[in-house]
Amino acid sequence: MSEALALGFSEEKRSDVGIAATEAATNIFLHGRGGELLICPSKAGEDVCLDLMALDSGPGISDITRAMQDGFSTIGTAGQGLGAIGRLADDSSIFSAPDKGTVYWCRFLSSGSRERFRTGIINLAIKEETVSGDSYLIVRHEARTVFMVVDGLGHGAGATEAAQEAVKTVERYANRSSAEIIEHTHDELKKTRGAAMSLAIVDHNQKTLTYAGIGNVTGMIVAPGASKSLITQNGTLGAALPRSPQEFVQAIAPSSTLIMFSDGLNSRVGLTAYPGLINRPAPLIAGVLYRDFSRRRDDATILVAPLEGNA
């Protein structure tokens, strides 16, 4: 698998990824009434991982324990089922509900540890393009972590150029305030077609989150029984910046999760229709939300990060 090779995976791990992808795709075909298999590489600092997500909108799995036993998902094939995938992968989980389909996720690590890869990220180009005009960044700088999602205007190479320029600028100024980061990014994007971008900065000592955004990259903080939308300002980085970029600071409540997404997902994103999903791994949350809220007509990025442990 080319993605695993590009990430520097060993030959053995590349083989494991290939087996897992085949098993997951077969499971969708046999039981999911069609669906998608997403291959999502992610990066945090020098560490990288590869997520496989099998998404379907089929009848759901009534007995998840049985489904995870060897052979259940691929009876009649040469495969060994979801249980075998779970043993090959470094981490895995499943979410299923009656008449709402199933999302199965597994993760393969190149380096680092599971704790450093608690975030779930999906970043996909529109089908007609080979590159995404969206991007993201996660950077840890001393006592804080910066999460960023950017959406270059339009799609294709021009949008990608704007998004990657934003990534480089945010990484360069990651130790500054969110307002300063936005101002620097605006200046650097003047040579591009522009972008929308939102930042969330977690202060690990103060246990606070500072949020700032320009344009239509949406952010929210969810917790069991609660959800709060994060405020962004109108404008376009590189073209039209508000005179004073605003920062919004709030304390991080227990069991909170940050969700950020581009307008490739519709604005109705939420977890209320999925009992128990808030307590599942972040990549699984990202997979469910992408499946059910992606517009499928634009580049799409969603970042899900549990804040307990990151703060």
Residue ranges and their predicted role:
Residues V17, D56-S62, F72, A89, ...:
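Structured catalytic cores of enzymes that bind and process phosphorylated ligands/cofactors
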Residues M1-T22:
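Conserved short strand/loop->alpha-helix "switch" segment adjacent to the catalytic nucleotide/phosphoryl-transfer site
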Residues E12, A25-E115, H141-M148, V202-H204, ...:
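Conserved beta-strand-loop-beta-strand hairpin that lines the nucleotide-binding pocket
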Residues Q80, S93-A97, G112-G158, A163-A311:
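Conserved subregion of the PPM/PP2C metallophosphatase catalytic domain
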